[in-house]
Amino acid sequence: HRLDEATVNERVDGLLDALGLTESADTLVCDYSAGMTKKIGLACAIVADPAVLVLDEPLESVDPVSGQTIRSILRRFVAGGGTVIISSHVMELVESLCDSVAVIAQGHLHAIGTLDEVRQGKSLQDRFVELVGGNANTGEGLTWLRRS
């Protein structure tokens, strides 16, 4: 469905304000920092109020204050009936935002279910490493790192 110009302008103004980008509204996106670009990408994705948002690393390069704002916006979107699909390597982010989780590595699905089902009593970080067969190398051979 097509949105009328007044609705688009109202939503854009609200998103720019919420994301702290109002003063940069006339700046070319190519001149934005990585974090600002990430925020503008979210604003572009959400302005039409889609049923589903698919976000890749939504908090990467974003400062903590903006990150909290983005989390709040995403929670509000979900509370309003929307669905958010997040791809992230930051398990703490996944644990704080997601109800359901799929662990995918090298194109293979290793686990899917609610957060608790996938974690199986562990942190999601530990469970992810367990599921994908993480490297147990702790750098013990790097003896030159010691200052003794």
Q: Where does each model-flagged region fall?
A:
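Conserved ABC ATPase "signature" region
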Residues: 6-24
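Conserved catalytic motifs of ABC-family nucleotide-binding domains
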Residues: 49
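Catalytic Walker B motif of ABC-type/P-loop ATPase nucleotide-binding domains
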Residues: 53-57
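Helical segment within the ABC ATPase nucleotide-binding domain
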Residues: 68-80
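A short, surface-exposed alpha-helical micro-motif characterized by mixed small hydrophobic
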Residues: 94-96
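ABC ATPase "signature
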Residues: 112-113
